[in-house]
């Protein structure tokens, strides 16, 4: 008889194992409990790790079926998900979601206690999970760190609803159940209690234990612990924030009627900083709206779409539904682990494309074309570092700064950006330049192309101090800078155009090196031209506005044709004077030298010393008589 029974048990165990191993591969044992054991297994189709709770069918496990029904009705990100149920003659295999992070108790024992920030995060997730259960009329009745698991991201997963039950509004429970240190005071009274209030008390004990690493009600005997719980006295010698102590005090209120509900807890000040709403379920509305991508994938595996919908609609929790839920879970993990763009970087990229008034160091690309030509207002402060001189530049409103009216379009001036300042005149050496251009005494005038002098908004113009510019000059002639007076009285959507014919500068090259640094960019060139030759600053009268004095940057004229791209990224060279002008200058200099040798004996009344070593003829009249005199290079001749 005993031998026959042993054979029957062997056949039964073989059948039981086959029902399980047909879909899962057992890996190891996770734990052993009073009612059964938990195995770690791998799903053969999706290779998903799962936890399988093996519960033998017996009178002791009369609560297995209520737990299964509760798990079937729960679908929340912070609650362990039921995946598959295998019911055999001897055992019930409950396939659950596997939380790789282990128990919360192990985490607390490892670190002693948790930081308040971590307590805040985990406690909020617990509140959301418990709020979801209470809304469905389910009470846990065994909240403790051993029944709180952590997933691969460290998030809470509430598990073990073996002592849980479903209640209706106003229903009282009479069964004493739970773990003693986490039991509420009303459980020790001989009357009914509210299951929701007991869960809130246990939640307060868990929060206290996370923040301190100690149980609030502890003792060496059952009676000692019971008396402390009924009295509601617990140590407050730990260094916690006042807000956290306030939450603990409200949760551990002895009177269950004065104890807050989970909805009240969610509105506590300690839980409100991040304004995070309760997370949605991962499997919400899967019965009526299955994921199309998962349906296609399961179709490739050989599953019938109609069978999939039927299994989800009726919540069979069979092999078909288990495969769908595992694929859904993997899809959710992939979406969370996918790297997304950083909002702060995008914000910096967006801000980098917008105009700003802050001084920043930036690089102008060769492909970026300035929309408006602008003046530059450099700061007076300059720094010298490692042979480099840097100047900070500010941007002025877009104004027209061209010398050729025919080739340069007009630019409208925005009234909001115009800084009203009137620069009446500029002093350059001893020569005064008025608002209208004047020709020099030699009658020489140069044709200048349209130059757009502008600065990089929010950037620094950097020029090297040295002989780089002098080497790049070659045979080019020294050309004076062109200064214009800016009048911005008409700012309301008007176009300003001015034709400027600059005079020839009498300043020597030695004096020209004493000016400020500047940046010159032409209409066709996109690169920054770092130059060493500079111009003296403007002096202004009756200035309207604030800021440093306007300092015009020196420019070197070039042919208009070359401005369209032939000199892209290169320095401009100054064209030589016309051939007839050079011949006339040579003849004139020879004539002056001949007259000087012939008339050396005449009395000298005044000599002229040009500052720029150029041959200039100055006409003057005599102070004492009616006859004028003509002076050539310090030699006075009688006027005819």
From Swiss-Prot:
It comes from the Eukaryota. Its EC number is 2.7.11.1. Residues 470-481 have a biased composition (Low complexity). Residues 289-329 form the UBA domain. One of its GO terms (molecular function) is protein serine/threonine kinase activity. InterPro entries: Kinase-like_dom_sf, Prot_kinase_dom, Protein_kinase_ATP_BS, Ser/Thr_kinase_AS. ATP binds at residues 30-38, 53. Residues 359-381, 390-399 have a biased composition (Polar residues). Belongs to the protein kinase superfamily. CAMK Ser/Thr protein kinase family. Smok subfamily. This is Sperm motility kinase X.
